[in-house]
Structures are given as structure tokens and as C-alpha cells.
Amino acid sequence: MQNQRIRIRLKAFDHRLIDQSTAEIVETAKRTGAQVRGPIPLPTRKERFTVLISPHVNKDARDQYEIRTHKRLVDIVEPTDKTVDALMRLDLAAGVDVQISLG
């Protein structure tokens, strides 16, 4: 796996879960002898929703909700075969979306 790079993008609604998952990935990669760059925090996406709480009139009565999507990026620069095997066996939290790309 020489001259390879593994790029891992993580997304989650809870920032504590995503930080815990990135720490597990970085620790696993370093333990198997790979060079790691990151975790790099990417911009947080904020989706806002406004809902009328009145059934008929009173347009001024509204509730506002927000969903924040936190993102992190981890680059594993020189992965070994042990690194790939350890990352495949790694069990992360259920609320974290993981995208892996080889480059």
C-alpha cells in the first residue's frame, strides 16, 4: 500500500460522538504504524426550520428548530496492511456516518 492515502470523512449530529470516533480512528492508525493527518474540523452545516404553531391565525406565533451536522476529516498518509485490517474491524458509534476513499 505504498504511495496510497486513505481519506476518511465523518458526519454526525452530536459533536461528542464524532470527536470520540475520530479519536478511535487516529489511535488505531497510529498504533499500527501509519502516519495520520487530522482530525480536521470541516464547517458545520446548520439547517433551520420555522414552523407555525397556530392552527389558523396568528402568523407571529412560530417555533424555530435547528439541526447541526458536524463534519471531520482524517487523512492516513502511509497506511500499512495492518492499518487497513484494523480500520475494517473498528466498531464506531451508531450515529456517525463514515465515508472512506482511497487516493
From Swiss-Prot:
Part of the 30S ribosomal subunit. The keyword Ribonucleoprotein applies. Belongs to the universal ribosomal protein uS10 family. InterPro entries: Ribosomal_uS10, Ribosomal_uS10_CS, Ribosomal_uS10_dom, Ribosomal_uS10_dom_sf. It comes from Tolumonas auensis (strain DSM 9187 / NBRC 110442 / TA 4). PROSITE patterns: RIBOSOMAL_S10. This is Small ribosomal subunit protein uS10. SUPFAM superfamilies: Ribosomal protein S10 (SSF54999).
